[in-house]
Structure formats: structure tokens, C-alpha cells
A protein has these predicted regions:
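Substrate-binding pocket helix/loop in short-chain dehydrogenase/reductase
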Residues: 13-15, 19-24, 111, 123
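Short C-terminal tail/terminal secondary-structure segment
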Residues: 9-12, 142-143, 154-167
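Residue(s) in the substrate-gating loop at a strand-loop-helix junction
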Residues: 58
Length: 167
């Protein structure tokens, strides 16, 4: 099992104002590191007869978030969708399943360092179930995807956002 859980927000900036070096740095951490993890584990998984790769993306990898000018974060998380789906079809016959997880607002260090308490309350109110997620919410989904119980699941996008992207 490989869980790629790399991610930084980086500089929040509209496209025209973002420094190219910062864009590349964010993509290197959020996207290229995931590619490298997969590249280096797939041969071992093939020799073992299969495995599960779980790429942690974001709802920002599914939909643009209005009011949050963060082109590099969005681009890097959208890229994980294509990487996941392509690897799923390339290695399915080898018994390797590849899926992505797209969390919404989850109470992590990234959230608490980038949002004020007031902003977290606003985020909670914007979620249909009226709370932000906890890390355990995501870990339960990851455990399922890592297990044999998800043996017929590959190339899938799993949204865990309390219904936020449904509105």
C-alpha cells in the first residue's frame, strides 16, 4: 500500500500575480512527489502481484473554489486526477489499484495555520452537515481503499467533503 499524502497550500495568488518559481515549488511538492512515489513503488507491487495506491488530492482537484485565488494548488491537485486514472488503467492487469481521495475542509495543521478561527466557523457553516471533517474521517476511507474490501475499485475519485461540492 502506498498513500501519497503530500500537500502544501503555498502562496495564495491569482495566476497573473504568482511567481513562476513558487508555482513550480507547489507543483513539485503536490504533484511531482506523488508521481515519484508511484514510479518507485509500482515495480515492487508488480513483483508482489498487486497493491493499492491512494493519492490524496483535494476538492480543489475537482472544482474551482470561488474566492480562493490559488492557481498552483488547484492545478497540482487537478493533475492528480489524471495521474491516478492513467495509472489505474496502465496497472490494473497487474493487480494494482489506484484511487484518489478528495477531502474538503478537514481540521488539519494546514487548515489551522491558513485559516483564522472565524474562517473555520464560516467553512463549517458552508458544509451541508455543518462541520469540518476530522482526520479520522479521511483515514477511514483510506483504510477501506487500502483493504481487499475495495478490490473492485480502481481509477475512482472519492469525495469526502460533508456534501460541500454538492451545493
Amino acid at each position: 500500500v502506498l498513500v501519497n499524502n503530500a500537500g502544501i497550500v503555498g502562496t495564495v495568488s491569482p495566476c497573473a500575480d504568482l511567481d513562476e518559481g513558487e508555482y513550480l515549488r507547489i507543483c513539485a511538492i503536490n504533484q511531482t512527489s506523488v508521481f515519484l512515489g508511484m514510479k518507485h513503488v509500482i515495480p515492487s507491487m508488480k513483483r508482489a502481484g498487486g497493491g493499492s495506491i491512494i493519492n490524496i488530492s483535494s476538492i480543489s482537484g475537482l472544482v474551482a473554489i470561488y474566492g480562493t485565488p490559488n492557481v498552483a494548488y488547484a492545478a497540482s491537485k487537478f493533475a492528480l486526477r489524471g495521474l491516478t486514472k492513467q495509472a489505474a488503467i496502465e496497472y490494473g492487469a497487474d493487480g494494482i489499484r489506484v484511487n484518489s481521495v478528495h477531502p474538503g475542509y478537514i481540521r488539519t495543521k494546514m487548515m489551522t495555520e491558513s485559516l483564522t478561527d472565524e474562517q473555520i466557523v464560516i467553512a463549517s457553516d458552508s458544509v451541508p452537515i455543518k462541520r469540518v471533517g476530522e482526520p479520522v474521517d479521511v483515514s477511514r476511507l483510506v483504510i477501506y481503499l487500502a483493504s481487499d474490501e475495495s478490490g473492485f475499485t480502481t481509477g475512482s475519485e472519492h469525495v469526502i467533503d460533508g456534501g460541500l461540492t454538492s451545493v
